């Protein structure tokens, strides 16, 4: 009688173990249960999806902050000589918007731009007899403090002559990117 009892006990334990395993592994655990996303970010399968203007594992970082500050520009355009001058990037109206003062060492009015993650976009805009547009990106992760570098690709077109001055925006003209150092 001991052998059949032992066999029933083992079969019962095996059935209970199998049932527990099925229940345990078939449960969909909420991967977002312990995740808190800042700045109206939304957790999706354990990963925060950030609102525009924010980044980081928990959407805790304002994207444009790495661009804000004073920069030294080093550049040579397709029709201008090498130049060095200061610019300043300041926050603007929305969480993604910025304004750039002393852009091109020419403009009296600020140039408008916006930031998405590590890229600064200058949308096409016309002011002071010129059309300007471009993009720039951070080349270092160390830009929240004192140091950082932006490689800026942009173009300035004189509206009177329609002659462009290119700074790495179009590859075929062999122009060089403008380098902005903090």
What are these regions (language model features)?
Residues 77, 114-182:
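Beta-sheet ligand-binding and adhesion/scaffold domains
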Residues 64-83, 100:
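Tryptophan-anchored aromatic micro-motifs
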Residues 79-93, 97-108:
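Short helix-loop boundary/capping segments
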């Amino acid at each position: 009688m001991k052998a059949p009892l032992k066999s029933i006990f083992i079969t019962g334990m095996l059935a209970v173990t199998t049932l527990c395993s099925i229940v345990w592994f078939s449960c969909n655990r909420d991967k977002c249960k312990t995740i808190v996303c800042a700045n109206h970010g939304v957790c999706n399968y354990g990963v925060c999806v950030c609102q525009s203007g924010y980044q980081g594992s928990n959407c805790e970082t304002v994207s444009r902050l790495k661009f804000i500050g004073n920069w030294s520009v080093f550049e040579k355009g397709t029709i201008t000589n090498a130049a060095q001058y200061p610019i300043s990037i300041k926050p603007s109206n929305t969480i993604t918007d910025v304004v750039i003062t002393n852009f091109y060492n020419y403009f009296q009015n600020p140039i408008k731009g916006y930031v998405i993650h590590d890229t600064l976009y200058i949308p096409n805009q016309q002011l002071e007899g010129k059309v300007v547009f471009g993009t720039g990106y951070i080349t270092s992760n160390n830009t929240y403090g004192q140091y950082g570098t932006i490689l800026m690709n942009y173009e300035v077109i004189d509206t009177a002559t329609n002659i462009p001055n290119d700074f790495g925006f179009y590859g075929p003209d062999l122009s060089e990117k403008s380098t902005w150092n903090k």
